[in-house]
Structure formats: structure tokens, C-alpha cells
Design a protein with these regions (language model features):
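Exposed, interaction-prone extracellular/peripheral surfaces
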Residues: 1-217
Length: 217
């Protein structure tokens, strides 16, 4: 999450998006909590709506990540244990983890009755692999150096990225999760618009189900 080619990192974008959504939901009178994680949960603020809580949340988001490898499985298991009431869970991550690890991790949240909205944060260079000269690439999470010819590996890279993205979206459809891709050169207002549309669509689905249930009673 520490990679960035647009003047700021994916982590910076994700924290700003989380702060924006937290401020918006708090302004609506909703209780808002926070989890930050890499290979484990780093910060946990239970959902609350009281004086000073939003400031605590913003201060927690200002802390820089450790840069270690992201692992969704252990943190999301812990999150599902800590959330006591059903509610809205917004997950913001680059999701660059094996697809077969994502479904059980996300499934714990939906199985508990939570509404889940997922933002996959990617840098534009990760989508296009817009490099042209052979060079050393550093995996910013594992810190491994790899000497690669971008033109030679671009087709294979893009094929694997497309397969990974399709796998993530299929998992979200199966679990009833609203999925959005947030590219870091995209204005945050558009991500907020995606969030609002997700909530609006969810409300329509719930109302339709309620109406059908009432008619059959």
C-alpha cells in the first residue's frame, strides 16, 4: 500500500478516503469505528458517536503504516470477532493477496449479517504497468529487488491482474458485497459518489424484500 506514482501513495489515498467516509457518516449521526491493519490489526477504535471520537479516528488515520506485508485473513478474522452488532463495514485495501484467501475472510463479515462495501485502491501504474526501460523494481512490502524488462512482462502482468480482478469481483457478487475500484488519480468525490450509490441500491433491495415478505404474510 506504500507505492505511489502520482505524488502520494495508495496508503495516503486510502486513509483520506476513510477519513472522508468517517466524517460523512458521523455527520449523519452514525456511530463510526476504525480498524487499520497490515498482517494484523494495528489500530482499533470501536464504533461510537460522541464528542471527541471523530478527532481520535482522524489522529489514528494520520499514523503511517509499517510497510509490512498485508494479509487479510488474520485481521478480518479479528475484526469479525470484535464487531458485536451488525452494521456497515467499509473495507479499503489494494487486495493484492491470493484470491483464494479473500472469500473466507470476507465471508466471515457477511455471514455475521454485516453490509460490506469494498474499495480496491490501485495506483494507475499498477493497472497499466506503464514502464518502458528495464530496471530494478522493489516490492515495497517484502523489500525484494527484482530486475525486470517491463515491455517483456507487461502482457503477462496485465493478464494476471485481469484474472485477479475478475476473481475478486466474482467473490463479491457471491457474497453480496458492493465492489468499487478506486484508482489513486481519480478524484475522491467519485469514490464518495460510488459509496452513496451502493447505499442507495442496498436500501432499494431491502425495501423490495420487505414488501415481498409483507405481501406473503
Amino acid at each position: 500500500m506504500e507505492y505511489g506514482s502520482v505524488g502520494y501513495s495508495k496508503s495516503d489515498y486510502a486513509r483520506t478516503l476513510a477519513a472522508t467516509l468517517g466524517w460523512f457518516l458521523n455527520g449523519q449521526g452514525d456511530a463510526v469505528g476504525l480498524f487499520t491493519f497490515d498482517a494484523e490489526v494495528r489500530e482499533y477504535l470501536p464504533a461510537r458517536h460522541r464528542h471527541g471520537h471523530l478527532r481520535q479516528l482522524m489522529l489514528a488515520l494520520e499514523k503511517q503504516g509499517g510497510g509490512s506485508e498485508t494479509n487479510l485473513n488474520a485481521p478480518l478474522r479479528r475484526v469479525s470477532e470484535l464487531i458485536r452488532k451488525r452494521g456497515l463495514v467499509v473495507l479499503i485495501s489494494d487486495l493484492l493477496a491470493p484470491v483464494n484467501e479473500l472469500e473466507p475472510s470476507l465471508g466471515r463479515l457477511t455471514a455475521a449479517g454485516n453490509e460490506v462495501i469494498l474499495f480496491q485502491v490501485l495506483d494507475p501504474n499498477e493497472l497499466n504497468f506503464d514502464f518502458h526501460n528495464a530496471m530494478l523494481f522493489q516490492d515495497v512490502e517484502s523489500e525484494r529487488d527484482l530486475y525486470l524488462d517491463p515491455d517483456a512482462i507487461r502482457p503477462e502482468y496485465q493478464r494476471k491482474l485481469a484474472e485477479h480482478s475478475e476473481g475478486v469481483e466474482n467473490i463479491c457478487r457471491r457474497l453480496g458485497i458492493s465492489f468499487h475500484r478506486a484508482v489513486t488519480n481519480r478524484p475522491l468525490e467519485l469514490a464518495l459518489s460510488d459509496f452513496l450509490r451502493s447505499r442507495g441500491s442496498r436500501g432499494k433491495i431491502v425495501r423490495r424484500r420487505a414488501q415481498r415478505g409483507g405481501a406473503g404474510a
